[in-house]
């Protein structure tokens, strides 16, 4: 009796099954992050439990602990999703996100500032409630305090890169150093300033955006580059 030939499609099917499992795992992770983001926004950090997140995501609690470094790690993922505009977008490196790429590729200093500022009202609106929850939790949780410091350091470093990109294109006003530009960007674009103007004083996101673009241009750019949009 002849031996049947080996089936040639076994390996591709195994690869397909592996890719399918990876995509299912990624989809589950995204569902958990989105559920966590919603729950943290609604309940605050202290009021959020892993059980609530698991129920919202349709998974068991053990699945969350296998995927994230506890509640603090899940909060970090929720913040990243809020900044990016969703868990799926957060999976892409920052520099590959279209809005960020547009800022990086823009050569005109005034338009570079405007492109950057265009992204900020939405980010602040999504992140500001989480920032308040993080500040409250950081006061009593060392792990959250470290996360708060890390996120602020990352924001400061991001403003340093932005200031360097302005300087590289000759876009800084005479007498303004890269370090000063970094600190101005870091301060003026803080969640605190957004909360004071938009939340406390009732400015519209559009008014805040235009004010921020105009202020940064007037302080940082050479004369002749301050014209409003």
Spans of model-derived segments:
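Helix-turn-helix
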Residues: 31, 35, 39-73, 77
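Short helix-capping/turn signature of helix-turn-helix
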Residues: 45, 68, 136-141, 191
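Residues in the recognition helix of alpha-helical DNA-binding motifs
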Residues: 67, 77-78, 162, 211
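Amphipathic alpha-helical packing segments from all-alpha helical-bundle domains
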Residues: 115-135, 142-169, 179-183, 210, ...
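Hydrophobic/aromatic-rich alpha-helical bundle segments in the mid-to-C-terminal region
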Residues: 167-215, 223-229
